[in-house]
């Protein structure tokens, strides 16, 4: 059977897609990149916010067009959208031949068999259960890969549906994480990107204490060059974790700490732990302890209780803290969440206007950061040659894949993807940096 996978949404979802691909490969199925010509197209969806839901529906409809044209036989939809809208998908999208929830990725092979036998699989398992340990088919370039260390979330932010889609927080056993990490390192992965919905909480459910620092020290013993950290909850930083990040050379001084907002009233209404003073203290502590630190965060504008004063406070906070990278999203009420029932709403157009203003603030901060790098030499991991820019493209410690842009550079000889090279920064191009090989 020829199977094509389409993965939407976050890197955590991508890991699930890669696991399903490995299960299909091991069962003897043929994996193909393009949907056209496949027996089955598997679409692993995101259903977190409105834009993600729209992308998922558009992707399903595009696959349905291929099916109508006889280029695809069956469509199987998995992931967060199906977990959230099981009945609606079955009823309103008759083109979909089967669905699976977020607790059922391990059932992909029997689901495909049921599908091709004429059935309409509808497989949903316990989303709070133990994490299945499966091999993966890496879809990222061979020099970097994601390492997911936990599933689910216990933070219960008032605006977020993730706990209802992914279940309670479950850490993977450290020995399982390290076994997978060794396989990645042995396969030639140079940059290991540690992810979960909240990696700072790692270990508390299994071992009764936070274990991220201990895990990082073990990962540093493996043959990775870089270890990058994503999704750290701000009030769970221990001194041990900060010291480990500062002292371990392989752990990059790049931290993705989603804060969403800084106003105390908004944070409390959204069931976010901590307050503005604690955020300021944390960022000062991190900057003082970790040289060259680059911060990334996520921000939401237009949350309930965000009046004009709270929004101005957020703008001033960002100008004070100077967070180098940020993803900015206008709030969209998600059915089934406490925030969706709150009365202190901000108009959708106003939320979008505020998001645009925050993007402007962050653009100026990023420009200042880029200006500070001019003339300096930085280590760059080459991602390959970009035929459009006619330059090599890569990333320094300050750029995470897909979300932070790249550094484009010239060289008088071939630079291989996965090679680390020194690059002198000489300019900027549409917010991204340009440079030249500094050998």
Residue ranges of predicted features:
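Proteins enriched for Cys/Gly/acidic motifs involved in redox and nucleic-acid/cofactor modification
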Residues: 1-202, 240, 255, 277-288, ...
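Conserved, mostly hydrophobic/aromatic
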Residues: 157, 177, 194, 229, ...
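Terminal RNA-binding accessory module
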Residues: 341-439
